[in-house]
Amino acid sequence: MRKFYTSESVSEGHPDKLADFISDSLLDEFLRQEPESRVAVETLVTTGMAVVAGEVRARSAHVDVQKVVREAVQKVGYTRANYGFDAEYSAVLVSIHEQSPEIGGTVDRSEEWRQMTPQERARPENTFSEVGAGDQGLMFGYATDETPELMPLPISLAHRLTRRLAELRKSGALPYLRPDAKAQVTVVRNGEPHEATETHVDTIVISTQHSEDVSQEQIEADMLEHVVRAVIPHELLTPETKFFINPSGRFVIGGPHGDTGLTGRKIIVDTYGGAVPHGGGAFSGKDPTKVDRSAAYYARYIAKNIVAAGLARRALVEVAYAIGRAHPVSLRVDTYGTGTLSDERLADLVRAHFDARPQAIIAELDLQRPIYAQTAAYGHFGRPEFPWEQTNKAEALRRAAEELKQEA
């Protein structure tokens, strides 16, 4: 039976992604000045205006918010007033206030930590029990062997397309391109990803903002030659593959002038393209004490190491927290029947080799540093520059699994 899988990606100039980039650029500047900053910053961008609001706790950081916002807009490419939104002339409104002391206090001293005696706090196993989760919630991490980066194929291909559009725009190779763009890829298989013997691209959709002086015919020809065929493996394309290039027609008005953008509205683009569940929490603008972000990264780290160890072809890791508590309230592993051990035994292995307390995650992945602006576009996963993409625990997991099999 044929099964269709679709994912989309949006460019760094898409208004929602611009908002994410601004929020993460501000986060990075706070962390650069004060690594223990607590930050939750949201951005709205619209015609001629950016609005930044949120909660911050930083004792020594002095961030020029206006400057950071304008530099972020400049980097993305909104540099002309006739775009309806630009780095120099658009207004920047700021409403940032202090983090709630009630939230800050429960994160600083977790419920478990408050109940310990000084002697208990000094024990090695409690080193990372001081910091509590910044909120309740559930987070998912996923890995699959269908691509070298252990990501679902449709989202991987969609990100390639939008990255390529940005490269061609910034290099001047296609001078009519403008910052706002989207791509969507539909992959068809004759079964589940781990079972399929045939895979090809059924449909590609590209919508790209452009200048007024280019024809639809020129855009279509360039997208096929310089974008699609440059980044999509030829063996995945067939004579039946369908292409829709700017199917709405002209796309001159774009970016925040065409659509208002908000931080956190592209959570499926940011993760696995709809291949697996999502807990609902966005990433951008949040410091790593917010488990919406750090625990989702850690769940990916766990899932990727499971697959890299050869213990499953697909792995979904779900972790959940209560605000103010250090230890997760639940952890679940689902390998979709591809595991070399039962999911329950794999979950036991995960608990033995990974520490999902927020403070432990921050320490292990070195998250209190300015690395977040680069996550804002083209996905947070499947990119080797990020620490949660390491597979440094795969060998230990493999050995532990072998020992369990021998004991059975």
UniProtKB/Swiss-Prot annotation:
Keywords: ATP-binding, Cytoplasm, Magnesium, Metal-binding, Nucleotide-binding, One-carbon metabolism, Potassium, Transferase. This is S-adenosylmethionine synthase. It is found in: Cytoplasm. InterPro entries: ADOMET_SYNTHASE_CS, S-AdoMet_synt_C, S-AdoMet_synt_central, S-AdoMet_synt_N, S-AdoMet_synthetase, S-AdoMet_synthetase_sfam. It catalyses: L-methionine + ATP + H2O = S-adenosyl-L-methionine + phosphate + diphosphate. The gene is metK. GO terms for cellular component: cytoplasm. Binds 2 divalent ions per subunit. Binds 1 potassium ion per subunit. Mg(2+) binds at D16. The lineage of its organism: Bacteria, Thermotogati, Deinococcota, Deinococci, Deinococcales.
